[in-house]
Amino acid sequence: MTGSEIAEFMANQGNSVYLIEMLPEIGTGSGLINKIDLMQYLFVANVEMLTNYELNSIGEKSIKLQSLKEDREVELDIDKVVISLGVKSDNEFYEKMKNNFNKVYLIGDAASPRKIAHAVREGFERAYILR
């Protein structure tokens, strides 16, 4: 989702934006309602979405993409590249806090990468316990 949100932000700043995804669909890690909203925002912002493509190389003023569906390479003229890849857990802050405070919980992507709906639910459940 982060890459999609960055694409929307940059497009709304007046940039022409390509959103390149290796998977067959944009926003597969989000819930249905979030995905519908996301796709509407990207459409309104005129973000050009390319699915089933892999980044092969970044040149000074272009990028080369390889289609994952057919034996075809595409070259796009660009000015800037923003790369948003995957999710990695980071619980460093939790480790510092757990010994200094009672009722410290590790949640969301800090615990392990997951879909946003699961992370939000987990946050709600932990907050409910703390009330």
Residue ranges and their predicted role:
Residues 2-3, 46:
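Intrinsically disordered, low-complexity Ser/Thr/Pro-rich tracts
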Residues 3-9, 25-35, 92, 98-101, ...:
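A conserved FAD-binding loop/helix module that cradles the flavin
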Residues 11-96:
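A Rossmann-like FAD-binding core segment of flavoenzymes
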